[in-house]
């Protein structure tokens, strides 16, 4: 919110420096971002009256004789398309400073002497977005009464001081000049004095011309007024100055009035051209899926049922609370204006403006709240201004649908409650003084008092809110310093926090270093290593194209980190990250993504470097898999690894899917050589594990089992198998043999070569058996081995050696 200090002083008698005011407002609850003076850095800019203006042949230039209050006319060469005889302009005389500290000097253009420069507002440093459209491509024309030689600062209010406020959602009442004036008045114990307009209505009734219908519960109130015989023209300079200093571009007197009322009251308004209506009934309703509307910015908007529209004859003419429609836009030929003042559901407006990426001054106020008490007053004020500035005739009455509560909100508390919370010894008289400054009525006594909170302060509803107001206005610096009183509370980690700690212990114990990568990446990298890619959630306004989409995997960002290090000769890396990925199964423009906690690590280079005793040991698949196994041993969870050949960007022969109770929870393996080449990194192994799924398993109750006092028995078995048979196949065959007393399977030897037929290999296992309730006999163990042997022969075609 940009607050003009000149304008503020019209509403409340305050005569302090802006620095002092900013400090005071910040300490009482409204943060001040800063104070700027538009004229800062500018000098020697005066009013000039163009006495004559001649075109320079074969150029776009004009040779002007300008009266700048000196004894002689000043010759200035100007190339602006709208320069002409008889107008008042901004002249930078030699020695003047304009935007970017540029100094104006005497010079020659096409051989013609130029004793200064006729300036546009852009050349004074004003933003393109706030310059009136009529002057956006040329010089600024000053009012007819401007006196040649006078400083231009007062004519354009460039000598004003602009206070930028950072308004939090709970203080949306300060999104208006009246709201800020109330706040400043309370701080300094002053009274506000707001301008009142004398509205003169015609005998003709507005209700005879139009009617209003509300067909959505998202519309709390809708009011309309008709002003006829208006003359659309540029606004007077004082109004344009106020709008520009508030960051709003002047358009014409009708539109500018609605924006002025928006700034004054915080009440969004809209003006329709009544003659462009194809009907007389204004309907506030939900849009229909697939309905379209071209808004004032010329963009065609695709609407959905959650959007609110204003319709006439079943055709949308405005996107309610956000932006008007082009079909009923006020133009230079408009004669009859329909003014709108409404209250729409803030949540609905926020969703619509967010979905369409269409933020406006109106939408921001509807999102944060509207003062119900001044909706009707703002409408009448706008109509009266159109009488003054556009010569309009106001038809009698507002056409209104919906009733708004306007009575004050009663909040009761006690003096004891206030003093206990603040640690003070305030009296009832002190409390009365505070609420008198705020403009709140108060009644009662020290035992109990009731405060009537006006509707302009919709953030106050409970006792604690009253305490906050008392503390703000009384002064935080006056509150006594006391030690906090609080009993000890037992803290506890969440299950996910505990899981993160255990994962971090294993990772760092394995020699991994923690890193944090960006959650935003490119759309391509967002899904590159995803096992089940979902819809991509993209930002509407990304800072860079490389950070435009929420990631669905952590691996791609981790590989960027590895590439960065490898490029700087740091080639032996072992890193991990515990972070979130974002899965989107719905519509990214409407639904929030699901956040999934993951554990990811990456390994590249050497595990052990070469020395005089040992060879260098590079990272391999089994080293990475071993870290995963160590993690699940720590977590006391049984997982299985299944060869995976179809995972994008991963090596088809060195990648495994990780299964927990048959459910896929991640993968481990080598990055595909082609992908590694794209990242410009050497052979790299990665793993990504879904911690959110593991968390649910961690919460299962553990069943205690007695430690058996009976010894275990081990038997070794050597198998001759085809090379295609995997360790997993063998373990599966053993486990499904139906032997209940089998407690452990350990592979201790693999051999292929001499004395083994080509295409075959030898694998030796140690099998452990144990009966928790009795000693195992040799006969029992022999039967178990027979079952296992039979299963191996039948299921993997093994030959017992």
From Swiss-Prot:
Enzyme class, broadest EC rank: ligase
TM region positions: none
GO biological processes: phenylalanyl-tRNA aminoacylation
Superkingdom: Bacteria
Listed cofactors: Mg(2+)
Molecular function GO terms recorded: ATP binding; catalytic activity, acting on a protein; magnesium ion binding; phenylalanine-tRNA ligase activity; transferase activity; tRNA binding
Localisation per UniProt entry: Cytoplasm
Catalytic activity annotation: tRNA(Phe) + L-phenylalanine + ATP = L-phenylalanyl-tRNA(Phe) + AMP + diphosphate + H(+)
Pfam family, any one: FDX-ACB
UniProt keyword annotations, A-Z: Aminoacyl-tRNA synthetase, ATP-binding, Cytoplasm, Ligase, Magnesium, Metal-binding, Nucleotide-binding, Protein biosynthesis, RNA-binding, tRNA-binding
Every FDX-ACB domain range: 708-801
Entry's EC annotation: 6.1.1.20
Cofactor, how bound (note): Binds 2 magnesium ions per tetramer.
Assembly: Tetramer of two alpha and two beta subunits.
Family designation: Belongs to the phenylalanyl-tRNA synthetase beta subunit family. Type 1 subfamily.
Alphabetical list of PANTHER family matching this protein: PHENYLALANINE--TRNA LIGASE BETA SUBUNIT (PTHR10947:SF0), PHENYLALANYL-TRNA SYNTHETASE BETA CHAIN AND LEUCINE-RICH REPEAT-CONTAINING PROTEIN 47 (PTHR10947)
Protein name in UniProt: Phenylalanine--tRNA ligase beta subunit
Species this protein is from: Streptococcus agalactiae serotype III (strain NEM316)
Higher taxonomy: Bacteria, Bacillati, Bacillota, Bacilli, Lactobacillales
């Amino acid at each position: 919110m940009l607050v003009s200090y000149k304008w503020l002083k019209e509403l409340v008698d305050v005569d302090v420096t802006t620095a002092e005011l900013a400090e005071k407002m910040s300490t009482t609850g409204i943060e001040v971002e800063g104070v700027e003076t538009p004229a800062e850095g500018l000098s020697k800019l005066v009013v000039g009256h163009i006495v004559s203006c001649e075109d320079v042949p074969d150029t776009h230039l004009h040779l002007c004789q300008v009266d700048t209050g000196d004894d002689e006319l000043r010759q200035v060469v100007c190339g602006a398309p709208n320069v002409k005889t008889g107008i008042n302009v901004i002249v930078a005389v030699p020695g003047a400073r304009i935007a970017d500290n540029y100094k104006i000097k005497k010079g020659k253009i096409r051989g013609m002497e130029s004793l200064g420069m006729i300036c546009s507002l852009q050349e004074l440093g004003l933003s393109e977005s706030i310059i009136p459209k009529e002057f956006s491509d040329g010089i600024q024309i000053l009012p007819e009464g401007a006196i040649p030689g006078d400083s231009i600062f007062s004519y354009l209010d460039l000598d004003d001081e602009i206070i930028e406020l950072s308004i939090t959602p709970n203080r949306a009442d300060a999104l208006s000049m009246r709201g800020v004036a109330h706040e400043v008045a309370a701080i300094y114990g002053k009274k506000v004095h707001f301008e009142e307009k004398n509205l003169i209505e015609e005998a003709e009734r507005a209700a005879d011309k139009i009617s209003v219908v509300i067909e959505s519960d998202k519309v709390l109130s809708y009011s309309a007024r008709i002003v006829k015989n208006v003359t659309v023209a540029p606004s007077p300079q004082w109004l344009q100055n106020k709008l520009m200093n508030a960051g709003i571009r002047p358009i014409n007197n009708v539109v500018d009035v609605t924006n002025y009322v928006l700034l004054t009251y915080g009440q969004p308004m809209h003006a329709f051209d009544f003659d462009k209506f194809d009907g007389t009934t204004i309907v506030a309703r939900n849009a229909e899926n697939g309905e379209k509307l071209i808004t004032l910015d010329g963009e065609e908007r695709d609407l959905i049922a959650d959007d609110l529209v204003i319709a006439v004859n079943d055709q949308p003419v405005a996107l309610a609370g956000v932006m008007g429609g082009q079909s009923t836009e006020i133009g230079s030929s408009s004669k009859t204006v329909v003014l709108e003042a409404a209250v729409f559901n803030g949540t609905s407006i926020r969703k619509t403006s967010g979905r369409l990426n269409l933020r406006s001054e109106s939408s921001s106020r509807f999102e944060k709240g509207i003062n119900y008490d001044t909706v009707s007053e703002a409408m009448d004020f706008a109509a009266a201004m159109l009488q003054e500035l556009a010569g309009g005739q106001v038809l009698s009455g507002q056409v209104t649908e919906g009733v708004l509560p306007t009575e004050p909100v009663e909040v009761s508390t006690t003096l004891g409650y206030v003093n206990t919370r603040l640690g003070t010894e305030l009296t009832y008289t002190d409390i009365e003084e505070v609420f008198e400054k705020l403009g709140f009525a108060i009644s009662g006594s020290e035992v109990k008092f009731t405060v009537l909170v006006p509707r302009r302060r919709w953030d106050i509803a409970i006792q604690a809110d009253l305490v906050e107001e008392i503390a703000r206005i009384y002064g935080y610096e006056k509150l006594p310093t006391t030690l906090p009183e609080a009993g000890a509370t037992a803290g506890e980690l969440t299950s996910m926090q505990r899981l993160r700690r255990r994962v971090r212990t294993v990772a760092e114990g394995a020699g991994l270093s923690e890193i944090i990568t960006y959650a935003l990446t490119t759309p391509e990298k967002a899904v590159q290593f995803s096992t089940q890619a979902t819809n991509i959630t993209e930002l509407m306004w990304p800072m860079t194209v490389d950070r435009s989409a929420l990631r669905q995997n952590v691996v791609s960002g981790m590989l960027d980190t590895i590439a960065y290090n490898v490029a700087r000769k740091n080639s032996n890396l072992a890193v991990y990250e515990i972070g979130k990925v974002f899965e989107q199964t719905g519509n990214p423009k409407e639904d929030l993504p699901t956040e999934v906690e993951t554990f990811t690590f990456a390994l590249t280079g050497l595990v052990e470097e070469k020395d005089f005793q040992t060879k260098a040991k590079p990272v391999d698949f089994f080293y990475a898999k071993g870290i995963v196994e160590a993690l699940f041993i720590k977590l006391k969870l049984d997982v299985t690894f299944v060869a995976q050949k179809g995972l994008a960007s991963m090596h088809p022969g060195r990648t495994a899917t990780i299964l927990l109770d048959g459910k896929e929870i991640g993968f481990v393996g080598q990055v595909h050589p082609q992908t590694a080449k794209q990242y410009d990194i050497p052979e790299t192994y990665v793993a990504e594990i879904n911690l959110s799924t593991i968390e649910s398993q961690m919460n299962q109750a553990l069943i205690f089992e007695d430690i058996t006092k009976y010894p275990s028995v081990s038997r070794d078995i050597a198998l001759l198998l085809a090379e295609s048979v995997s360790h997993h196949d063998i373990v599966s065959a053993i486990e499904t043999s139906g032997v209940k007393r089998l407690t452990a399977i350990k592979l201790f030897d693999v051999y292929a070569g001499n004395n083994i037929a080509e295409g075959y290999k030898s694998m030796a296992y140690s099998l452990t058996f144990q009966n928790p309730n009795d000693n195992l006999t040799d006969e029992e163990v022999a039967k178990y081995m027979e079952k296992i042997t039979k299963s191996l022969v039948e299921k993997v075609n093994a030959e017992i050696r």
